């Protein structure tokens, strides 16, 4: 290689050979600063991208090349593939370029290249926070919309509540109230009324309906003698109250329904979610006029208006008019004399649901079941006294109670003298 013309020799091969010979003579490795500088300068002057420089040129396989394109804002390459020193290129182990020599480049052009790459990386990293995916924007809009809906529903729930003042005036130091409005699980403390000793009260927001409650006075369950009382299923005395809505409260649901419909249309316009074709057609149909042309109009299903019913205190004429009462009794006399089938004029002695006593009815299942179980009783005879027909000079008296899905019948047999 030394005998060839220096002009025809490849510059890269000459520099590499000289660097290798100098390393052999001096007994040193690639740590020599002079050889590293010349080797770095040689590689920096080589244009490996131009196919006219080196013939024949073998294509180099790059695993990944970092390319920054400011026009492409949708996709940002992951920063995990970037090198901290800003080189920005990784080569395959099968490439002809030595990785150790490429990492030792410290020339001015290498520094400029590193600075440019670092600047581009910082520019791209600074641009990243301003670029937000559409999914994050949609998620933020959905959360804001849900908060608005929760606020509207909370206002609606508060609009259905009415203030109720519960008072206690029968002494005690610590007074609490619990009831059906708290599920009988929480106690609400009463506060004394200023200027009125011995009087304690609490103001609650309750929905319309019947509410039962009891007081806890100094760790003792009590009920107030100044409030309406009733008994629960266990026979304990409780207080109750009826919370009724104002007369003009019935018109509010219609107004709220109209406002909800208008808000729903506005929300559909503001929503950025993709709508299906059927939904878009439905919205367009609602905006179109009812007159479709050629004598056709759009049909709207409307609920019929309820008739206005009023409660009266008028007594029927059969109880006040003597002529009507006389005619009624004459009809009864004719029925008794002629034995005609006019049973509709005579009221029954017992309601129809009480005529069939459970003690007198026998189920077909009793032929197979010898346990003596009775059929499921009617709900109207629960907690009532029932009697059976007299059989064998014995009278049966029974009482039926229910516990969840079980019925217990207690029967007492009394002999007749």
UniProtKB/Swiss-Prot annotation:
Residues 137-149 have a biased composition (Low complexity). Residues 152-342 are annotated as: Kinase-interacting sequence (KIS). One of its GO terms (molecular function) is enzyme-substrate adaptor activity. Its main location: cytoplasm. Residues 1-37, 64-155, 250-269 are annotated as: Disordered. Gene3D superfamilies: 6.20.250.60, Immunoglobulins (2.60.40.10). Transmembrane segments: none annotated. It comes from the Eukaryota. It holds the Pfam family AMPKBI. Coiled coil: none annotated. Residues 343-417 are annotated as: Association with SNF1 kinase complex (ASC) domain. The modification Phosphoserine is found at residues 12, 21, 44, 135, 276, 279. Residues 1-12, 257-269 have a biased composition (Basic and acidic residues). GO terms for biological process: cell adhesion; filamentous growth; invasive growth in response to glucose limitation; regulation of cellular response to glucose starvation; regulation of invasive growth in response to glucose limitation; regulation of protein-containing complex assembly; signal transduction. Signal peptide: none annotated. InterPro entries: AMPK1_CBM, ASC_dom, ASC_dom_sf, CRP1_MDG1_kinase, Ig-like_fold, Ig_E-set. Present with 3590 molecules/cell in log phase SD medium. Belongs to the 5'-AMP-activated protein kinase beta subunit family. Beta subunit of the SNF1 kinase complex, which is required for transcriptional, metabolic, and developmental adaptations in response to glucose limitation. Has a structural role, mediating heterotrimer formation, and a regulatory role, defining carbon source-regulated subcellular location and substrate specificity of the SNF1 kinase complex. Promotes the relocalization of the SNF1 kinase complex to the nucleus upon shift to nonfermentable carbon sources. This is SNF1 protein kinase subunit beta-3. It comes from Saccharomyces cerevisiae (strain ATCC 204508 / S288c). The gene is GAL83.
């Amino acid at each position: 290689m030394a005998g060839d013309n220096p002009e025809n020799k490849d510059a890269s091969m000459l520099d590499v050979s000289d660097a290798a010979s100098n390393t052999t003579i001096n007994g040193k490795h690639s740590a020599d600063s002079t050889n590293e500088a010349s080797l770095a300068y040689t590689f920096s002057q080589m244009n490996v991208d131009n196919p006219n420089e080196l013939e024949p040129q073998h294509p180099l396989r790059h695993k990944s090349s970092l390319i920054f394109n400011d026009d492409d804002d949708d996709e940002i390459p992951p920063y995990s593939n970037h090198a901290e020193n800003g080189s920005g290129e990784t080569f395959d182990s099968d490439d002809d370029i030595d990785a150790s020599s490429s990492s030792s480049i410290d020339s001015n052009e290498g520094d400029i290249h590193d600075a440019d790459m670092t600047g581009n990386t910082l520019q791209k990293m600074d641009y990243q926070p301003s670029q937000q995916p559409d999914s994050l924007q949609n998620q933020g809009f959905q959360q804001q919309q849900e908060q608005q809906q929760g606020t509207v529903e909370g206002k609606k729930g508060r609009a259905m509540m009415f203030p109720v003042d519960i008072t206690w005036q029968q002494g005690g130091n610590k007074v609490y109230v619990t009831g059906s409005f708290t599920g009988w699980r929480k106690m609400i403390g009463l506060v004394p009324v200023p200027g009125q000793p011995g009087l304690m009260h609490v103001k609650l927001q309750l929905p319309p309906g019947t509410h039962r409650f009891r007081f806890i006075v100094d760790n003792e369950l009590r009920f107030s003698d100044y409030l309406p009382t009733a008994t629960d299923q266990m026979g304990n005395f409780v207080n109750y109250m009826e919370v009724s809505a104002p007369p003009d409260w019935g018109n509010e649901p219609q107004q709220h329904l109209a406002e909800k419909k208008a808000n729903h249309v506005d929300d559909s316009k503001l929503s950025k979610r993709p709508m299906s074709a059927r939904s878009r057609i439905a919205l367009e149909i609602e905006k179109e006029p009812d007159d479709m042309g050629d004598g056709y109009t759009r049909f709207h299903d409307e609920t019929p208006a309820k008739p206005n019913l009023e409660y009266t205190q008028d007594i029927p004429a059969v109880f006040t008019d003597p002529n009507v009462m006389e005619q009624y009794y004459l009809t009864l006399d004719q029925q008794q004399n002629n034995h005609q089938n006019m049973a509709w004029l005579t009221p029954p002695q017992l309601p129809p649901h009480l005529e069939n006593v459970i003690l007198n009815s026998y189920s077909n299942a009793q032929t197979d079941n010898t346990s003596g179980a009775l059929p499921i009783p009617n709900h109207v005879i629960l907690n009532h006294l029932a009697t059976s027909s007299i059989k064998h000079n014995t009278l049966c008296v029974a009482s039926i109670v229910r516990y969840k899905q079980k019925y217990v019948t207690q029967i007492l047999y009394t002999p007749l003298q």
